[in-house]
Amino acid sequence: MTADAYLIDKARVRRSFDRAAGTYDAAALLQREVRERMLERLDLVKLAPQAVLDAGCGTGHASAALSARYRQSQVISLDIAMGMLKKTMAARSLVQRLFGFDRRHAVCADIERLPLAAASIDLVWSNMAIQWCNDLDQAFGEIQRVLKPEGLLMFSTLGPDTLKELRAATRQDNTHVTVSRFIDMHDIGDALVRAGFNAPVLDVEYFELTYDDVMGVMRDLKAIGAHNAAEGRHRGLQGRGFLQQVQARYESFRRDGKLPATYEVIYGHAWKPQARVALPDGLSPVQFRPRASSST
């Protein structure tokens, strides 16, 4: 199977999330839990941002939390799906909308093509969104471009063990992608370094959701818009026989009467380095340190 088979069809992603905007919140249990854990991590960071970007905002709960936390900040809610942005902006109260107490803005765009000025953002936040990017170098390069010097990127995404049970149950041959491919934590760290970020910190956490049957797994994925959007996916109807085969294979994972769905969640944060001062040709910086005092 070629690498192109794993490329994400962005038009399909947009349509899927547009359709899922009304059902997303009820099914996004994992996304909520990860968001709260990211907010706890943010408690440890001393930051007073003037501008915050919520990249891949979904229905906007993180945007609201960031706006409440940083009340003097402009918060930009960015998503590829207009349906999600409409939910985000509709959630603002009437008073906030009439009197401008809520300093939030909505932008429909792709993380890989940010329509924002260079060095305009202090904090980029992204909860479980960058797995929908085709080119991680491009995505991190864009984030690094829009961050101000000493700006912070804080994100979560999905690792390669995500939905490993479903991947095993749906595997047919080596010609079609049945579950999206997710990037390893070490490769993400390498991409951050290539993009110019300072000393990225990453760690991983595993979550297991349980279901009565495989259709419950499928329903939740559909409700949050997480369809298989790989270019190498099977394009036709696969029929009742294939579904029965998937159900039978998934049963091999049943434990204590439940079917598991594993999610590997990768957390990361990294800083954009301070801008360097350009010196005339032939000059180099000299660092002075105070001489240690000595007693006589």
Swiss-Prot record:
According to its UniProt record, which reaction does this protein catalyse?
malonyl-[ACP] + S-adenosyl-L-methionine = malonyl-[ACP] methyl ester + S-adenosyl-L-homocysteine
Enzyme class, UniProt record, top EC level: transferase
Q: Which InterPro entries match?
A: BioC (IPR011814), Malonyl-ACP_OMT (IPR050602), Methyltransf_11 (IPR013216), SAM-dependent_MTases_sf (IPR029063)
- Name used for this protein in its record: Malonyl-[acyl-carrier protein] O-methyltransferase
**Keyword S-adenosyl-L-methionine in annotation:** yes
Q: What the protein does? A: Converts the free carboxyl group of a malonyl-thioester to its methyl ester by transfer of a methyl group from S-adenosyl-L-methionine (SAM). It allows to synthesize pimeloyl-ACP via the fatty acid synthetic pathway.
Query: Which pathway, per its entry?
Result: Cofactor biosynthesis; biotin biosynthesis
> What domain of life?
Bacteria
Give the family this protein belongs to, as stated in its UniProt record. Answer: Belongs to the methyltransferase superfamily.
- What keywords sit in the KW lines? Biotin biosynthesis, Methyltransferase, S-adenosyl-L-methionine, Transferase
Q: Does the keyword S-adenosyl-L-methionine apply?
A: yes
Enzyme Commission number(s) from the entry: 2.1.1.197
The record's section on Pfam families has: Methyltransf_11
Family matches, as HAMAP family: BioC
MF terms (GO), sorted A to Z? carboxyl-O-methyltransferase activity; malonyl-CoA methyltransferase activity; S-adenosylmethionine-dependent methyltransferase activity
Q: Which GO terms describe its biological process?
A: biotin biosynthetic process; methylation
